[in-house]
Amino acid sequence: MVRFLSGIAAVLLVAAPAAARDILFVGNSFTFGAGAPVQQYRPDSVTDLNREGIGGVPALFRSFAEQAGLDWTVSLETSPGKDLAFHYANKRAAIDRRWDVVILQGYSTLDADNPGDPTRHGIAAGQLAALVHARNRQAQVELVETWSRADLTYRPGSRWSGKPIAAMANDLAAANRRVARTTRGISGTIPVGSAWNRAIATGVADANPYDGIDPGKLGLWADDHYHGSAAGYYLEALTIFGRVTRYDVRRLGAGERSAADLGLTGQQAAALQRIAWETLRRRNR
């Protein structure tokens, strides 16, 4: 009888759904999806802690989770043009609660006054991580490695001017990984910029929006050549989702509904899913 009841308990345990998890996105326009319809995508599916009615990349994450059968409660705290130090100084009251996962996305050049310098970025990341871990010592805190800005690559006056389009993203990735290695409480980084680079290198996406978008390729930047397009944010969201959940994003498939909502074809969605998966696989080797 005891063995029989134990067997039933085991079956029930296996059949029980995974516990819901909470994720918070902290960032700026690269998180809320400025310059693309992503910004207003399904705002009712997420909780905007600033009550601005934003969906953004967090709403794409939630959509992927629903389609994958994963139970995630998704929140965001975003402000345009701000770095992580701003969020720590001004938004602690909103952030200071229990989270399972927190995604930190900083300024596009790490430091507005000293582009490429991760010092201020790293200090603020550590402060936010400490705030999060005071509520949940097991929380996963990840830094987003953002993409190369075409405007800072193909126009003069930037430290990245005239360099290959992959250079800025590579520099940002190296800086974020250094912060993760040396800052207590940071679990790791998410290679969004590397995914953009891979999409360009493999011919899925166009390298230079200033000379037009090559036929058959996707444009990853918005019209300002700075923020993301629908495709660019879609690739960002896929990379974050795959990293956080360890879900093989290729399984979302050509029929993934958010891609269709954003005007991407099934073929384009599948190509971006493959790029995100390949980027994460290479990173995890």
Which residue ranges define each predicted feature?
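Bacterial N-terminal signal peptides that target proteins for export
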Residues: M1-I8
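Extreme N-terminal starter segment of soluble prokaryotic enzymes
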Residues: A20-D22
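Conserved SGNH/GDSL esterase-like catalytic core that processes O-acyl groups on lipids
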Residues: G33-H133, A270
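Short polar catalytic/cofactor-binding loops
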Residues: G27-F32
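N-terminal signal peptide c-region/cleavage motif recognized by signal peptidases
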Residues: A15-A18
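Conserved catalytic region of serine esterases and O-acyltransferases that act on ester linkages
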Residues: G188, P209-R285
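Acidic carboxylate-rich catalytic motifs and surrounding loops in phosphoryl-/glycosyl-chemistry enzymes
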Residues: V74-G81, I190-A195, A254-E256
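Alpha-helical cap/lid subdomain in secreted, periplasmic
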Residues: A93-A230, G242
